[in-house]
Amino acid sequence: MASEQDGFLPAATRGDSNWSGVSGWESALSAMRAEVPSIDSDDSSLSDCEEEELHIFQREDTNLIPDLSIELLDDGELNSEVVTRQMSLEKVEFSDSLEPSPNVCVPLSVQKAELDDTINSRNPETEQLCPEPIDNIQTESMVGIKDSEKEDGFRHVLHSSVTTVLKPQINSNVDSEYEIHPGNTEKEHLSTSALSSKPVGLSLQFLECLEQWDLNALLHQLKEEEVQEREMPPLILSMEESTERRHKLIMEKLVEFAAQQSEEVSSVPQLEEKEKEGTISKSSFRPYPDQKMYLKGSGKHPQSFSTICLDLRTTVSKMGQVTSLEQNPENPSQRNEQKEKHHLNKTDHTGKSLLLRNRHNIQNDSLSDANMSNSESLSKEKKELGTPTQRKQRPKSKVDISPKLQEMVGREEKDGREEQEKEKEILQYLPPKSLINSRADEFAQREKQEKEKKARLRMLTQLEDLKPRSSVNGRQPMAEATPILFHPETSYCPGISSLPDVARSGVETLLLTICLSSCGQVFIPGQHGARSSYPSLFLANTFHCLLTWLISLVPGVNTHGKVNAPFHVLGLQQAWQEEGLALYACLSPRQIATQSSPKIRKHKGKQDLRGTSSFYQRVSLFLSHNTLQSVIWWSEDVVERLQGKLFPLPTEVPAVRLSSIATLNSAPEAVEKVFSSACGFYWQTLETEEKINPLLSEIPTDSETEVVSVIVFERMLSNPTAFHHTLHIIQTEGLDVCGVRLLYPQANALHSYIDTVPSSYTGGDGQTLPVLALALRGTQAEHIWAEIAGPFDPQLARLTDQYSLNAMYGFKRGEPIMHWARKSGRLLQELSLWFGGRIPPSGSFNIGFQNPYSRSTQPRSANLRSRSDSEKDVTAFHDTDRCRPPALLTASILGDVFLVVSPAVPSAAYGDVIDICLHRGFALYGLRRLRLSAKRSAMLSMSSTQVSIFCPNVPHSQTDAQPCRQPRLHCFLLLLRKENAAHHTSGLIQALMNELAERGLLGAIHAKFSYICEVDPSFCFHVAPYTDNLLQSLGGSLHAMPDLSTVPMDMLSLRPFASDPEDEQVVVLTMSGKHTLRRAGYFLQKILRPTLKTPASNTGSVHDGFELLGLKWLPSLSRLQAKEITPYEVGDRPWQRSIEHLISNPALLCALRRSNAFAVLQHTIKQLAPTLGMEHPQLIASATPEIAFRQAALIFSDRDLVSDPESRSSLMYIPPTGINCRAGGTEDRRGTTESIFTYMLSGPPVLYTVLLLKPRIWSSALGKILYKVHQQKFILVGMKPVSLTTAMCSQILPEDVKKSEALCLTHCDYLTSGPCLALCLQRRGAVLKLLDVLGPEDPELCRAQDQFLWRAQYGTSAVQNGMYGSTSYQAAIRDIKTFFPEGLLFEESTVLQAEQIPKLTSDILVCSRSHRQTVKNPACGPELPTTDLPFTSALCQTTCLLFPPHMLRTSPPPYIPALEQLMAKEFHITAARLTAFDQLQAQLVAEMYSPGNYLTAKIKLLTEGPCLLVAAQRDNAVTCFPSLVHSDDRHNMSAQTLTEQVLCPQTESQANKMLSCFFDSLTPDSIHQILH
């Protein structure tokens, strides 16, 4: 320490060559070193001794008062000090921005701002003249102590009786000194002397050198150099007191000084005006040129801070041998020089310093006058204070002052008088002394609080650095949402007792331990009970029953009196230790009449009870003789509470004895270790037997896990039914009980923690009631618990949420049954209060070795070397004990499970399934649709009943009359991940069943199981834990991409895609991004089963939902996939950002199908997830069929895309799936599957349907009807008049009509009243399209729906509705076989070939040997003049027109306008038929129409395709046919077509022959009949 002190001594005491001293100085200095405190202490030492030190004040140099060592002292105290200061003969002028005027109070913030501006605006010349601030001038002390420079902030250095000497070096050989001698007068004597090598007498060497200087040249040089303006640094010197009175006096003045410096004093408006007028004087100080070189060479930073040194200790200084100075300088010239020196030094202070000095003078008016120079009183005072004797000075009568210096001194005297007047004005505005003291106390309190806050933040930082980074054994990373249980307030308050006072009064206690396999699950070793579908549910129910039972045994809570256990439960808590997670209970004997100890029966455990207490034996026998079912007497009440639920979780528990679940420990230190040991500040992540997919271990779950702290009061704890019901609801809602602790808080402490406390906790009777602290953990735990608990007011809860806990068990608002933090800001505080550790007063505690696994594979030496810096630097913790302290809050590692959805659940509910899983906190990591075999079901541990449901077979027979309803064969497989996943699977299944019931989907499921009364959850869902072998047996990776090499080349080539919106289209939907995937189930639910109607499509589809073809979840997309999926083009600006977003986020991709799929899906996306203002859309749909095909080929394989017959809206209007295989003659015995890729390329197949025009409709409107048929893109492949029988009529009647016999008879009478015209139409989706354009059966409903529907135009009533259309695909095939048994006129068709419908190649009526004859209709004869039949004129004729094939093939077909032209010319059609001729028939027909003329050409024309035969009647229809057609407009194209291209008879006999050859019947209103 001596060497260090020597380093701080000034150059004079270290033997500097420029300093001459004697042994007297050295002896004085050596005597004082022992009393001087060390100045080299670091910050850490200061922080450790904060209570022992008194930190007065610290401020930057610009805001401190310079040189307050004189102003703070009284005149008497000034007499006890000799302040020696070296001053230059020139002054450096300070600017107003650097130093406030002595007459104006300037705020400190303004001073600092002005100082910064001044420093920034310095010019290089000024820095060269004065590169070092004034406070860096070398200081010397007569006792040998030098102020040390600050190294790391302001350092308070204490030393005694320091006299500062500011010594500028003029040159290497000459030193000068100015001494200020405060005497009994107010005048100060200015003297100059040179330092000599002798202790007595002063050398005149300095004065001799001074006489040789040219002061005029020196002043001129200083004016040119523009010296930088600076403020004299402050220096508060320590005072050495000899009495207690003086010690208190200096303390009061220091407090006053600190208060004035810390608070801004408002200035007077008059002073502000004077400052603006420039009346404030400026002080200046200029060093010598040689002094500037000394400062430049000192090497100190210009902005370094000075050290404020105070010595508040009352130490006794040692007298040293010093040189004596003359006490009565009588030389007048010396007094004048001192007076000039006083004026020179006076302006070196700020206004505040001068103000303080004047105030000291006013307060000490009682002291002796400043002009007195009584040497005896001075000498006596110095002896009392122990001040060294002053050195004598030689008279300086020979020294002459230059005229310029005298002028300067005169100016300063004038300025000094003005300053004194201004100081008197300022004194009246000073605050009172009491206010200064209160502000000082407030400042000290704030400083203390700030230090405590910083210390606690450092503690938090150290705890964060040592936080566990993984699970207890390092298998997985630390669970999320596990904050450090540290709070700046609660962690320093006293801990809450976990045992009552009676447990510490010497009563016998036992430790009951119940091992837990995970949070909320009891570990039962050697469990061999009956096989259960939900083994985890049994373990959870066991935990609920045990916890409720132990709570019911707590004294003060047990009010029901139904307990027969021989013990009380005093303490209860769930804690993790190195041995694992367990529920601990402290047992004590009951305070009732002593029971006789039962005899120990002879059994195997008898040896274990020897040497134990009777209490231990009673408890042990009770546990071994009772089961859990026998002690839960309230179980039936809990079952009654669950009756209102649709699918409540069962509450059964395994029939095991309590001794197989719990163990006893009679050691006294066992209870002490569990309930009295200091708990830790960290969560621990418990490891279970669950596994996760290693390929997906790096993908975060992002499950929004939250924690809730709940305090259960005595009213709830005393009701076992209520508490057990609460635990059951927590399990049902998917929350983990991660912390349980029974506490005994004091009444006043409990009121300070909780706002509203029940009245039973007032503590008036001296009894401390317990509370139970629960910590709940799960996804959105705060929201879920708020719904479970309900509103705080029980009356309001009963109105708004009758199933909440407050509604069922609450009493009144002022008597709560529970408390939980409703504000998220209080969560950490409450967790730290109830479950966190405490910081001891010493600040040293054990946190154990939190990450031992990370160094278990390294040598011990390597482990020590690899320790992080945070662990090395922590001094408050002891990690020598590698055992981790108990953790009262635990989380579980992540686990994967397979959820299998049976085929009985419709695919339209898959969105609901995904949404419930995500809502319950399960993260989605894979999807697949697959068929289960018996082997796979066995690996999934399914029961025999489940196998028959999850592995259905194909039905063997189907009726042709009903639509093909092939059952769903594929299951839906999901890979889910969650903390403690196996524990929550039972609650997940229960939530899924409730969701299906609320959506109304259980009816469809129950219809498939007609042999059962209720739908069991096991029929719909099955859960299996994840294993790698199970994943491989289920088809391998769920994220496998298709192999593009297996795709046929013709699929990848350029080709047209079916894009008709009326057909079924396949579209690919992509959901990308974590935020989007959280709502993926909701989006899919609205798409598959929409509740809002989408805009009506042109097809008028009867179902608005989509058919789900494929689902796939991918952890990320490849760049090739992202380029196909992005909605932007390459030239778009956001294209690149969209690609990066897609490849860096998981995605869920769906393949969907329905009619007009692209337009409907785009409209749905706009409603669900608007993209306005979003750079990355949440939902991306493929824009065209070609893009959809490319996206599907990159993502799905042909096995991944599976059609869903039950959810396909158009299933009954399309052929069955295996139609192609049946056409080829091959069929798989397990059923055929549709290739979606083939469907996307070829589109839907061409179908056929039957349109039946009912009697008296088609004869007058056939042309218009055929025109409408052509408008809807139908192709006519068959047409013939048919006469219906009763059997035929019943075949085409609707099902609701068949139920009424009278209504059925009415329909049959109408249908048999005349021939109907049957038309067979061809197009894609023909069946559904025809039903769409026909409309409802009732024409009135048609007109209300759309007036352009066909039945609305041609129907008159529900019976005479005009038309009939095939109602399904199977009905269409049946109608074709009924009305067209001879076949149809079609090209090659796979559907008709599969349905065995022949192709018509020749006409079945045209024959040369036909015996049919055409005769006049008797009903139209002249003997019946009153008949209402039309066309009864004698001139009426019937013609037979033949439309050749070329008129039917072209588009638009010319035959339709020709028929309309006939209708316009009042022709009445009596028969029409579409037929085809072979070669012989064509020759016969050609000869009939034009015998001998162009026979060969006509034969060729007739055999090119189908021909249309039409029988029409009118007056002169045969003889005047050309003139009738051209009568109005000869330029009409339809008329020209009829005359030029249509074949017509020339004579009436020829026409009659044709009618008998081509038709077998005519309409009843025809003038002719065909006789057979």
From Swiss-Prot:
Residues 324-335, 361-374, 849-865 have a biased composition (Polar residues). It is found in: Dynein axonemal particle; Cytoplasm. PROSITE patterns: NDPK_LIKE. Residues 1-21, 262-304, 324-428, 849-871 are annotated as: Disordered. Residues 1249-1382 are annotated as: NDK. Expression is enriched in multiciliated cells in the epidermis and the nephrostomes of the pronephros. Disruption phenotype: Mutant multiciliated cells show a severe loss of ODAs from motile cilia. GO terms for cellular component: axonemal microtubule; dynein axonemal particle. One of its GO terms (molecular function) is dynein complex binding. Residues 336-351, 409-426 have a biased composition (Basic and acidic residues). InterPro entries: DNAAF8, NDK-like_dom, NDK-like_dom_sf. GO terms for biological process: outer dynein arm assembly. The keyword Cytoplasm applies. Interacts with DNAI2. PANTHER family: DYNEIN AXONEMAL ASSEMBLY FACTOR 8, NUCLEOSIDE DIPHOSPHATE KINASE 7. This is Dynein axonemal assembly factor 8. It comes from Xenopus laevis (African clawed frog). The gene is dnaaf8.
